[in-house]
Regions:
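Short beta->alpha junction loops/turns
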Residues: 11, 73, 96-99, 151
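Rossmann-fold NAD(P)-dependent oxidoreductase module
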Residues: 21, 105, 109, 157, ...
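An N-terminal-biased, well-structured beta-alpha scaffold segment characteristic
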Residues: 1-92
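Phosphate-binding beta-alpha-beta segment of Rossmann-like dinucleotide-binding domains, i.e.
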Residues: 86-145
């Protein structure tokens, strides 16, 4: 028994790499790319899995579809339309896969601003050489409190980084 997986949308080089890796890892997996509407309607008739965005018209021939992989962590408004919600299709997304990367990036900014690097970088760029190191707006992080607004995956990972730097952390989820 084979499993047919369809990528909806245009080929971009990355998708082909994923498809190759998927086919090598999963014996019997058939991967298709459907960028044109007519081809999407045909390929979805036998598909068990799909990556992309469906609409009402594309859902009609997708009788065998069991899994829809959303192309974003937070799909746009209208992605989950009533017919899709009422179907037996399992929908997954990227939620959580960037928590560590984004929280590390946030901490890079916290460290930069806490040491006044944004001022020094601007001065250096403008060839402004001053002896203002002793007047640096440095903030000692263990004496600071971080307010995390939104304690989902990224907020929780950021809170953990802040704790590692000795900060008091307050998290709220609006």
């Amino acid at each position: 028994m084979s499993f047919k997986f369809v990528f909806l949308g245009k080929k971009d080089g990355i998708i082909e790499k994923y498809a190759t890796a998927m086919q090598e890892a999963v014996p019997g997996l058939e991967v298709y790319f459907a960028s044109e509407r007519d081809q999407q309607l045909v390929d979805l008739t036998e598909a068990s899995g799909c990556f992309g965005t469906l609409d009402k018209e594309l859902l009609v021939p997708a009788k065998k579809l069991e899994w829809l992989a959303a192309p974003a962590a937070g799909p746009p408004r209208g992605y989950y339309f009533p017919e899709l919600i009422e179907s037996n299709i399992q929908v997954t997304n990227f939620r959580g896969i960037f928590n560590d990367h984004i929280s590390s990036h946030i901490m890079a900014f916290v460290l930069c601003f806490s040491r006044g690097m944004h001022v020094f970088f601007a001065d250096q760029f403008n060839q402004k050489w001053t002896n203002s190191g002793e007047k640096s707006p440095a903030v000692h992080l263990p004496e600071s409190t971080a307010l995390i607004v939104g304690v989902g995956g990224i907020g929780a990972a950021t809170a953990l980084h802040c704790k590692h730097f000795g900060m008091e952390v307050i998290g709220i989820d609006p």
